[in-house]
Design a protein with these regions (language model features):
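An alpha-helical support segment within catalytic cores of ATP-dependent transferases
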Residues: 59-63, 78-140, 232-235
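Conserved protein kinase catalytic core
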Residues: 8, 51, 147, 164-166, ...
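Active-site activation/catalytic loop segments of kinase-like enzymes and analogous catalytic loops
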Residues: 169-197, 209-226, 237
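Active-site acidic catalytic loop and adjacent metal/ATP-binding pocket
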Residues: 124-171
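A glycine-centered beta->alpha junction motif in the catalytic cores
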Residues: 43-59, 102-107, 210-227
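Glycine-rich, phosphate-binding/catalytic loops in enzymes
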Residues: 17, 60-61, 155, 172-174, ...
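ATP-binding pocket architecture of kinase catalytic cores
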Residues: 1-88
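Regulatory N- and C-terminal appendages and interdomain linkers associated
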Residues: 242-245
Length: 245
């Protein structure tokens, strides 16, 4: 049984479970049994395995996990043509992300410095100018704590942020955590993802990491998640070092 924190997240997750198990394959995601809209609750089948974030693995094993994650991510992104409404939402996603991150500047207790805000706004402006990027159905929170390892492979859980969007937001958390000091994991992911990112997508991904850094100091405390807060601070510090004159 899952209880979502808002009607928006409940609606997203319920919709995702309406077909994601077919898209990803047997045992690769929970299956929806029944939904209780009045309680924002979903009754789901159990998925075998344990969170990858808790696993003790060597470099080769982690690369294997990222290959499987790349395969599941590709299946989700290529799940089928978006209808008119979903495509409109997906194509507006990057502008919406820039607008949403701007709002976080005004509500976070750990407010970025003036220089940090200037760097962030520069990336937000660049993101708005990138133009059309490949879109699809994204997981929205793809990372090891939402990957379950079991003998037959890997499963995805927690689909409350699943939505139509540009595809690159699914790579942001991996880019600023898993891949940052482990380039072999990134390479393994893209070996099975099916294609390399375009130059515009790589640039968009960098811009989105800046937005994530600004979101984290607000989103972390909101969800009592110190890991998210720390992630934002690390990313912002790195961006400031890279943007020194």
């Amino acid at each position: 049984m899952r209880h979502d924190r808002s009607e928006k997240l409940f609606t997203r997750e319920a919709r995702a479970y309406g077909g994601v198990d077919l898209t990803l394959g047997h045992s690769r995601a929970p299956h929806l049994i029944v939904r209780g809209a009045g309680y924002l609750a979903l009754l789901l089948t159990a998925v075998p395995g344990s969170p990858a974030v808790r696993a003790v693995m060597g470099p080769a094993e982690w690369r294997a996990v990222h290959r499987q994650a790349g395969s599941l991510c590709a299946r989700l992104h290529e799940a089928g043509a978006l209808d008119h409404a979903d495509r409109a939402e997906a194509e507006a996603a990057l502008d919406a992300a820039a607008d949403g991150a701007e709002k976080y500047l005004d509500r976070t207790a750990d407010r970025p410095t003036e220089n940090e805000q200037q760097v962030f706004r520069g990336y937000a402006a660049q993101l708005r100018r990138i133009g059309p990027l490949p879109v699809g159905y994204i997981h929205g929170d793809s990372q090891p704590r939402n990957w379950l390892i079991f003998p037959a492979g890997l499963a995805l859980v927690d689909f409350e942020r699943t939505r139509p969007a540009a595809r690159i937001p699914d790579l942001v958390i991996l880019a600023v955590t898993e891949w940052l000091d482990h380039l072999g994991r990134e390479k393994a992911f893209f070996q099975v993802y099916g294609r390399a990112l375009t130059g515009a997508e790589w640039h968009g991904l960098r811009c989105l990491t800046a937005l994530d850094a600004v979101n984290c100091p607000g989103r972390g405390p909101d969800n009592d998640d110190a890991e998210v807060t720390a992630r934002g601070r690390r990313t912002l510090d790195r961006l400031m070092r890279q943007n020194r004159p």
